[in-house]
Amino acid sequence: MSTENTLSVADLARENVRNLVPYQSARRLGGNGDVWLNANEFPTAVEFQLTQQTLNRYPECQPKAVIENYAQYAGVKPEQVLVSRGADEGIELVIRAFCEPGKDAILYCPPTYGMYSVSAETIGVERRTVPALENWQLDLQGISDNLDGAKVVFVCSPNNPTGQLINPQDLRTLLELTRGKAIVVADEAYIEFCPQATLTGWLVEYPHLVILRTLSKAFALAGLRCGFTLANEEVINLLLKVIAPYPLSTPVADIAAQALSPQGINAMRDRVAQTVQERQYLVNALQQTACVEHVFDSETNYILARFTASSSVFKSLWDQGIILRDQNKQPSLSGCLRITVGTRQENQRVIDALRAEPV
C-alpha cells in the first residue's frame, strides 16, 4: 500500500485547531506555590455531604432542584435557566447555537476574559475585537462600526481582569444597537460581589440578552464546574438543542442544589462580606507599598495593580511560592498583575513579600 499521501495525526486535525493557542488557565500555567492567588477562587474549602447515591442511573438533563433553586435565587422563571459545566460551556453553547462557522463573527472588548476568543476559534467562528476605552468602558462607536456580521457580543461585567463594572447606560445603548441583529452576552461571573448591578431585570425588555453565571467564585465551588445561562425561554430552548444530554453528574447536581438552598445562599453572602473586607485591607496595604504604582478599583474578589517592575515582582513572588496572575500581555495592561483576595494570612504574605522588593 502506498504511503505517499499518508498524513500524520496532526495533519488530520482541522487547521484552526492545529494553530490554536489553548486558554492559559491558572492550572495550565502551573507553579509550585502554597499561596494560590491567580485563579479568583475562594481561598478556603466549603464542605457538603452527598445525599444522592443513585449513581447507576443517568442524571437529569437539567436537574429540577438545581434549576428551581437557581431561578428563585436569581429572580427569574425556571424556564429562563440552563445549567451547564461551568459558565465556560455556556459561552460555547451560545456561539454554537447562533454563529455559522466561516460566516458569522463574535465581538468582544479586550482586555477581558480569554475564553470568548478561544471558544470561537475552536468552533471556527471569526473573532472581532473592539478594545475598551482608556477607562476600560465600552467603545460604543467602535462596536457599532464592527457589528455587521457579528452575531454575538460578549461583555464581562464586572470585567475580568480589570475588576470594574461596565456603565449600565452603555449596556443599554449596546442592547439597543444590537436589537434584531445580535445576541448580547453579559458575563456576570463575579456579580455576587456587586449584586445590585445584575441585568436579570432587563431580560423582559431585551429578548436578545443572555446572562452567564457561575458557582465557581462567591459560592466557593470552582472544583464543581457548575454554571448557568439566564435568558428568555426562546433562547434557552435553542441552547437545549446543542447541549450534551447529561451535562451535570449526579454528585455535582446534588451539591449545587445544596449550595443554592436558603442556608447555602446565606453562607455565600457571608463569604462575600468577608471577601469585601479582606479586599479593602489588601487595597489599603498595596497603596502603601513602594513597588506598586497604582491600585485599580475593584467590584470583585481580585485586585488589579500596576507595578514598577512587574515581571521581576511576579517571578520573585513565584519563587517564594506566592502565585499571582501576570496580565502584562493583555492590551493596555502593561506592568499589571492580578491578585485574588485570599485569607488574611495569605494577603499579609503578599504584602510582606512586595515590601521586601527592591525599588
UniProtKB/Swiss-Prot annotation:
Taxonomic superkingdom: Bacteria
Q: What intrachain disulfides are recorded?
A: none
Where N6-(pyridoxal phosphate)lysine occurs, the residues are K217
HAMAP family per the UniProt record, alphabetical: HisC_aminotrans_2
The cofactors required by this protein are:
pyridoxal 5'-phosphate
UniProt entry tagged with the keyword Amino-acid biosynthesis:
yes
User: What is the source species?
Assistant: Salmonella paratyphi B (strain ATCC BAA-1250 / SPB7)
What Pfam families does this protein map onto? Aminotran_1_2
Question: What catalytic activity is recorded?
Answer: L-histidinol phosphate + 2-oxoglutarate = 3-(imidazol-4-yl)-2-oxopropyl phosphate + L-glutamate
A molecular function (GO) term: pyridoxal phosphate binding
Enzyme Commission code: 2.6.1.9
Write down the top EC class of this protein: transferase
Tell me how this protein assembles.
Homodimer.
Matching SUPFAM superfamilies = PLP-dependent transferases
Record-stated family: Belongs to the class-II pyridoxal-phosphate-dependent aminotransferase family. Histidinol-phosphate aminotransferase subfamily.
Keywords assigned by UniProt?
Amino-acid biosynthesis, Aminotransferase, Histidine biosynthesis, Pyridoxal phosphate, Transferase
Name one process (GO BP) from the record: L-histidine biosynthetic process
User: Would you tell me the protein name for this molecule?
Assistant: Histidinol-phosphate aminotransferase
The pathway it acts in is: Amino-acid biosynthesis; L-histidine biosynthesis; L-histidine from 5-phospho-alpha-D-ribose 1-diphosphate: step 7/9
Is this entry keyworded Transferase?
yes
